[in-house]
Structure formats: C-alpha cells, structure tokens
C-alpha cells in the first residue's frame, strides 16, 4: 500500500530519535543526483609501486588470491581485499614482496569501501567534497561513471556515509 499510494517513509533510530533518519520515497523527484549507496567493511588495501604492468595481478593469481578490486594506474597497482585476520593480510604482503623483487608493497588495514551510485557524473564531485569536508580521508578513489568507490577508514565509514547521503 505504501508504494501504490506513493507514501514516503521516515525511518528513525530508536536509540537516537533526535536525528532526522532516512526518508524513503517511491518516486524520484530529480533533486538528488544520487541513486543509492553500497558499502563493504573490514577491507585491506595493498599498494604496489615499481612492478612491471600486470605483474601484481599475475603474482596474486599465482598465490591463489582473489582480490575484491584491482586497479593499475601510472605504475601503481592498488589491490582491495577482504581483511580476514591481520596476520593473513600481513603474510600476503610479505609473499608479494618476495614475488615482486624491487617493488614497494605497502599494506593498509581496517578500511571500508563506500560506493556512491549516481544518476549522472555531475553528482560525483559534491559527494567526494561532502565526505572530505566531514574530515574523512579518502585513501583511494575509483571513478566509474556514473559513480565512484571511496576507500575510507573503517572507523569513519558511518561518518562518510552520512556526509555523502546529504550531499547536493
């Protein structure tokens, strides 16, 4: 009945009723360029500098690893992985260093992926600006029109999501 009659729902937290919550509408009013958000927590990121193109992906395959995301740009490879235990990701970083001699492999743990699905690419800059204005550092950014993936600290995921969701 709510969908049929186009009745908006206001969802609020039982624990924080003073907060505005989330308004869910059945129709798009055109005011927001954001279609929605998705996220994934407890991620780790490996950055690899100085390896030949394609070598990090080949090394990961040889080690039997399936990354969540792998991107290569200007001599840098960024690999996102489910964190698992800290020991597992640290061991993987050490194994990659052995597989890729001469390459610099750095590991960052306790990250989250926040994806903004945008209706147009014009909505991307305000989302990024809102997240950064909230004091959330974006460690890696992948633009994939119309949307983007932002890698943020896991502890700041909720702040990033709240900031992005109110961006204009």
Where are these regions (language model features)?
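C-terminal catalytic "cap/lid" subdomain
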Residues: 1-168
């Amino acid at each position: 009945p709510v969908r049929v009659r186009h009745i908006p729902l206001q969802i609020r937290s039982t624990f924080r009723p003073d907060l505005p919550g989330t308004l869910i509408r059945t129709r798009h009013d055109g005011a927001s360029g954001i279609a929605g958000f998705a996220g994934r927590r407890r991620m780790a990121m490996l950055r690899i500098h100085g390896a030949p193109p394609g070598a990090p992906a080949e090394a990961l395959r040889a080690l039997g690893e399936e990354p969540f995301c792998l991107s290569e740009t200007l001599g840098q490879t960024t690999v996102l992985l489910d964190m698992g235990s800290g020991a597992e990701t640290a061991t993987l970083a050490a194994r990659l260093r052995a597989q890729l001699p001469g390459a610099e492999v750095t590991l960052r743990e306790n990250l989250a992926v926040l994806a903004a699905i945008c209706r147009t690419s014009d909505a991307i800059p305000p989302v990024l600006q809102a997240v950064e204005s909230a004091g959330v550092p974006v460690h890696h950014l992948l633009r994939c029109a119309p949307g983007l993936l932002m890698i943020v600290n896991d502890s700041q995921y909720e702040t990033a999501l709240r900031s992005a969701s109110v961006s204009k």
